Amino acid sequence: MASLIHGHAYPPIVEAVTEQLRRGSGFMLATECEVAYAEHLCSRSPSFEKVRFMNSGTEAVMVTIKASRAFTGRPKIAKVEGAYHGAYDYAEVSQITNPTVWGDADRPNGVPVAHGTPAAALNDVIILPFNNTQRALELLEEHAEELACVLLDPMPHRVGMNPIEPEFLTAMRNWTKTNGSLLVFDEVITYRSDYGGLQMALEVEPDLTAMGKMIGGGFPVGGVAGRADVMDLMNPKGDNYVFPYSGTFSANPISMTAGHI
């Protein structure tokens, strides 16, 4: 799933990481290798105005959802039925379910994956039928004033690796722009598809992108990149610091060094 795109023990990564280990593996402060890698990633995709690092794809998706809520002041998200987005309560709703609880094809049920998932989480996730543009738009309209974001995987592997239809994607982009919601891409897997992620081939720019796996050179990593006005919500030196976020090993120099190779 793209976590070892270079293969096992790729010599340049082994050499660079070994050298970095001699300097230090975790400082809990910004490092030169973090800054260099952030600048590199932002140069690869037009939608990446700023980037922030964490430790996994699950964490990255969680951050995009929380940032979307902080930016819009809205509680709900929308996602595609059957799409996998990691283990965060809201992201995993209707990820994998028994066919007996799917509900109507035109109005899929919000089904928990983990037993004990709070009902509130299910109520705040709107499930969209994949590539059914008309019905998806109708469902979005029902919750237009409450939706913080629409979360999409451009090629969801849990629904058969079927690519997203251009009509569906364009409709989601246009709807979010019109209604003040954010369009979020989960490119934890698909970022390997193009130099700047699958979004480059699709020619649609999301507001936020979640990344993981392949940007770490085989080491634990996650990343969120996107619009500066949204990313600035996490900037403690900014004027609109409403989403405090940090982590002990986030942007650690080992993952940054390996990822930048």
Residue ranges and their predicted role:
Residues 1-261:
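Conserved N-terminal phosphate-binding loop of PLP-dependent enzymes in the Aspartate aminotransferase
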